[in-house]
Amino acid sequence: MDQFIKQDETGDLIETGMNVANHFLSAPIQGTNSLSKASIIPGVAPVLIGNPEQKNIQHPTASHQGSKSKGRGSGVRSIIVPPSEAGNGGTQIPEPLFAQTGQGGIVTTVYQDPTIQPTGSYRSVELTKIGKERMINRFVEKPRISTPVTEFKRGGPGAAAQGQTIQEEGIDGNGASAGSKERSGSLSGATLYAHLSLPQQDSTPANVGIAPQSAISANEIMDLLRGMDARLQHLEQKVDKVLAQGSMVTQIKNELSTVKTTLATIEGMMATVKIMDPGNPTGVPVDELRRSFSDHVTIVSGPGDVSFSSSEEPTLYLDELARPVSKPRPAKQTKPQPVKDLAGRKVMITKMITDCVANPQMKQAFEQRLAKASTEDALNDIKRDIIRSAI
């Protein structure tokens, strides 16, 4: 015989079980007065052997179940229908009660009203719930009863403890045995008395009180936060102003680069002029120099042609060094320098003093010097000192 179940057979078994469960759950509850043999579902007749009209219905279980429950006693458990749910014969039962089974495989159902009898659908649901409860209670271990602990004293057990007998604790069902208690065989009292340790709790209880009020320093913290917020806003305003001047800074950089380019061009032109005219100017006009180069004294000794001599200036003169010249040069007169307008420069220097000088004493000293200045050189010196003090 093949010990392995095929996949098709497993699927058929699962489908059959689901059909049986759906049949039990979907079967309507009939309100008949009695349970006839025609209403019994095929397959559960051995369980329902006996007269269904009796008040107490007892059904023996299978032989293998009875052999396992012989040592546990023959207990009988009952299901009691409350009077509120009891009625006349033929009434519909809204919710069937759980049927309980006792030891020995005996199922007993007790009704307070003899007129109410279970119908076929009720018994079907009852049998289904009996099997479910058996499967659940199969793995539940019954509570154990511990034997009292005898008090141990020096010199052996007391007179009251001598008459007590210790019985081994049995277990009713599957599970490990807790063992048996035995008295100490030592009568010398070498082993001291030890108290029984109490069971430990899962958690230690804690006292719950009213939550404390707000701390006193909360107001100080709020004031500090407000101050920090104000400082942050002030810094943000300054940063916004700095960012707003970004375009102006870019424009200043462009103008500065233009000025540097122009200055480099001027320096190149000045170097070219110095190369072309390395001498020092004397202040004599160019026409005068050309005329002095062209006019010269010619001495004719003896007869000869004197037609080449100029007849415009026949008279010669002697200069300061007794040199013969055709005409004495007029004395050089110094031209008076034009008086420049210094009012505009004074206004500019006054503005520089106001913007660049922060020290009140230095500002007053510059204003006094500006009032006394009457030449351009004095104004330039004042302007130079203002720039140095600002740096």
Swiss-Prot record:
Quoted from the entry, the domain comment is: The N-terminus consists of a long intrinsically disordered tail. The central part contains the coiled-coil multimerization domain (MD or OD). Forms a four-stranded coiled coil structure. The C-terminus constitutes the alpha-helical X domain (XD) that binds to the nucleocapsid (N-RNA complex) and the L polymerase.
In the UniProt record, does the keyword Cell cycle occur?
no
What is the stated purpose of this protein?
A: Essential cofactor of the RNA polymerase L that plays a central role in the transcription and replication by forming the polymerase complex with RNA polymerase L and recruiting L to the genomic N-RNA template for RNA synthesis. Also plays a central role in the encapsidation of nascent RNA chains by forming the encapsidation complex with the nucleocapsid protein N (N-P complex). Acts as a chaperone for newly synthesized free N protein, so-called N0, allowing encapsidation of nascent RNA chains during replication.
For whether the record's keyword set contains Lipoprotein, the answer is no
Name of this protein? Phosphoprotein
Residues that the record marks as modified (Phosphothreonine) are: T10, T16, T91, T150, T165, T250, T258, T282, T298, T375
Q: Where is this region: Disordered?
A: 54-98, 148-184
Report the domain of life of the source organism. Viruses
Phosphoserine modified-residue sites: S69, S188, S257, S292, S294, S301, S374
- Organism equals Mumps virus (strain Enders) (MuV)
| Quaternary structure annotation from Swiss-Prot or TrEMBL | Homotetramer. Interacts (via multimerization domain) with polymerase L; this interaction forms the polymerase L-P complex. Interacts (via N-terminus) with N0 (via Ncore); this interaction allows P to chaperon N0 to avoid N polymerization before encapsidation. Interacts (via C-terminus) with N-RNA template; this interaction positions the polymerase on the template for both transcription and replication. Interacts with host RPS6KB1 kinase; this interaction may play a role in the viral replication and transcription.
Keyword annotations for this protein, in alphabetical order, are: Coiled coil, Phosphoprotein, Viral RNA replication
- Chain coiled-coil ranges: 218-245
Q: Where is this region: Multimerization?
A: 216-279
- The record's region (Interaction with the nucleoprotein) falls at 343-391
Family of the protein in this entry:
Belongs to the rubulavirus/avulavirus P protein family.
- Cystine connections: none
Specify residue ranges for compositional bias: Polar residues. 54-65
Pfam families associated with the record: Paramyx_P_V_C
